[in-house]
């Protein structure tokens, strides 16, 4: 399992621990990932995704999972999230006809 958010694309960053004496040792900054179940109002389906804690609040701020997915940039989404977005758009179009 990769340490990457499926909705925002936030991944592992690398840097240094710096002590008081300025010695530098390499370290990894890992994202705070959570496995979350999102429920789509449009498709009435549940989707389990590995997302960062910051992304969870972004989804809530956007007005829910469907609103976030419709606004989301495809470049940041994982292949699973792209398929979910496509399914949401298709279902929304079918319901509007």
Curated annotation (Swiss-Prot):
Example GO biological process: translation
InterPro entries xref list: Ribosomal_bL28, Ribosomal_bL28/bL31-like_sf, Ribosomal_bL28_bact-type, Ribosomal_bL28_sf
Record flagged with keyword Ribonucleoprotein: yes
Keyword Chloroplast appears in the UniProt entry: no
Gene3D superfamilies: Ribosomal protein L28/L24
GO MF, one annotated term: structural constituent of ribosome
Pfam family, one: Ribosomal_L28
Record keywords: Ribonucleoprotein, Ribosomal protein
Domain of life: Bacteria
Any one Gene Ontology cellular component term annotated for this protein: cytosolic large ribosomal subunit
Family per record: Belongs to the bacterial ribosomal protein bL28 family.
HAMAP family per the UniProt record, alphabetical: Ribosomal_bL28
Protein name as it appears in the record: Large ribosomal subunit protein bL28
Organism for this UniProt entry: Rickettsia bellii (strain OSU 85-389)
Taxonomic placement: Bacteria, Pseudomonadati, Pseudomonadota, Alphaproteobacteria, Rickettsiales
Protein encoded by which gene: rpmB
């Amino acid at each position: 399992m990769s340490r990457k958010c499926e909705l925002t694309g936030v991944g592992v960053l690398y840097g240094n621990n710096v002590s008081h004496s300025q010695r530098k040792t390499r370290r990894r900054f890992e994202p705070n990932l959570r496995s979350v179940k999102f429920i789509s109002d449009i498709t009435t389906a549940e989707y389990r995704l590995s997302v960062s804690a910051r992304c969870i609040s972004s989804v809530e701020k956007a007005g829910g999972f469907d609103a976030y997915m419709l606004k989301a940039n495809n470049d940041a989404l994982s292949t699973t999230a792209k398929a979910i977005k496509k399914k949401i758009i298709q279902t929304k179009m079918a319901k509007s006809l």
